Amino acid sequence: MVTSPLRAFPADGYTVRWQRWHHDGDETLNLRWENEGWTATGEVGHEAVTYVIRLSATWQVRQFLLFRDLDEPDLWLGTDGSGRWGELNGAHRPDIDGCVDIHLGCTPFTTTLPIRRLKLEEGDSVALTVAHIDVETLGVTPVDHVYVRTANRRWRHIDESGATTDFDVDEYGLVRDVPERFRRH
């Protein structure tokens, strides 16, 4: 079955908000087009963090910045687009080489990255190794995730422990609700 394509984001940007499932925090995400790519800025209230993800026009991660309690980023990672990662100071991060996407557990937005980038058809799946970022410790580790497009706007995510989550996306590929975790508002 041919799947309908995702809608292009408005050129002047897009804002979406999620709330924690049990109303104990929220997130505001702003997407804007600049310098021939997308910049996603998320403010996650329940974690007291702000993240910035700079993406290519084809939704490949180029840079990731995480701010907690400083004006300067607590963590700043960059990739060459071929799976080689490093830090702002130029230090190579071979421990996460090969990862194309990143995963932050405090936001549903990072789930959108492979959805937008891969353009899977209904019934297709892909196994990816992603760079998982722990916002408390600033640890970055490679973890395996599987994404399955089960219907036009329905997906299944299987994490490294085998836990399965089904969720719906909107016309842009942004997660609507993740049961027991996040809901759009």
Give the role of each language-model region.
Residues W33-W38, R54-V61, T79-S82, T150-R153, ...:
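Short, solvent-exposed coil/turn segments at beta-strand boundaries
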Residues V44-H46, H157-S161:
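Short loop/turn motifs at secondary-structure junctions and domain boundaries
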Residues D159-H185:
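C-terminal structured interaction module
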Residues A8-I53:
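N-terminal ordered "arm"
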Residues G25-L29, V49-I53, E72-W76, A163-D166, ...:
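A structural detector for short beta-strand units
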Residues V44-N89:
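Hydrophobic/aromatic-rich structural module bridging two neighboring secondary-structure elements via a short loop
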Residues V2-D26, D74-W155:
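Solvent-exposed helix/loop surface patches that form functional interfaces
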